[in-house]
């Protein structure tokens, strides 16, 4: 397996990651034996990055990935999970992010994840599912920093992209 540096984090990730989303369905609808066997084969092939989120099977993907990794105990597994803040929680973003991460860690059976991603789109003005640049810089990033300083994750990411110009505006 080939590995590449993940930005400036110091992490070396396999060029092929293991997606635990509902598209293939294994980590949401598969049997425990199939999940364990498939993850074990991925690890044997050199895969070290596992991507999950609460949105994948309403937390079931995180629960199943946590169980499998606890059983297999891979030495170099890198786990990333995500938060998608629902519009109904935009009035209390910090609490929503904190609760989501705490719940994800509990489902995964981990004290810390390697990468915690924001999964909302970002636009200049926000609206719908999208956060505004002001919400991200004023509320999301400070909350992420506080949670990182508390040791709940190592690195942050943004996966919901949105408006490229808005992402470059700050």
Feature map (PLM): residue ranges:
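Structural recognition of the beta-strand scaffold that forms the well-ordered cores
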Residues: 17, 51, 78-81, 114-117, ...
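Glycine/proline-rich, positively charged
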Residues: 27, 90-170
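Structural motif corresponding to the early beta-alpha repeats
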Residues: 71-95, 119-122
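N-terminal binding-site loop/beta-alpha segment at the start of enzyme catalytic domains
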Residues: 1-77, 143, 149
């Amino acid at each position: 397996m080939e590995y590449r540096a993940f930005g400036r984090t110091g992490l070396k990730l396999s060029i092929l990651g293991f997606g635990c989303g509902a598209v293939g369905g294994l980590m949401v609808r598969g049997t425990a034996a199939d999940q364990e066997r498939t993850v074990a084969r991925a690890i044997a092939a050199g895969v070290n990055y596992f991507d999950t989120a609460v949105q994948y099977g309403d937390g079931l993907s995180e629960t199943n990935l946590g169980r499998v990794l606890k059983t297999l105990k891979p030495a170099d597994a890198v786990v990333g999970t995500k938060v998608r803040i629902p519009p109904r929680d935009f009035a209390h973003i910090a609490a929503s992010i904190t609760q989501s991460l705490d719940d994800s860690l509990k489902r995964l059976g981990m004290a810390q994840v390697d990468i915690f991603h924001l999964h909302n789109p970002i636009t200049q003005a926000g609206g719908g599912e999208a956060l505004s640049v002001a919400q991200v810089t004023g509320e999301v990033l400070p909350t992420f920093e506080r949670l990182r300083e508390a040791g709940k994750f190592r690195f942050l990411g943004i996966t919901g992209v949105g408006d490229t110009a808005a992402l470059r505006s700050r």
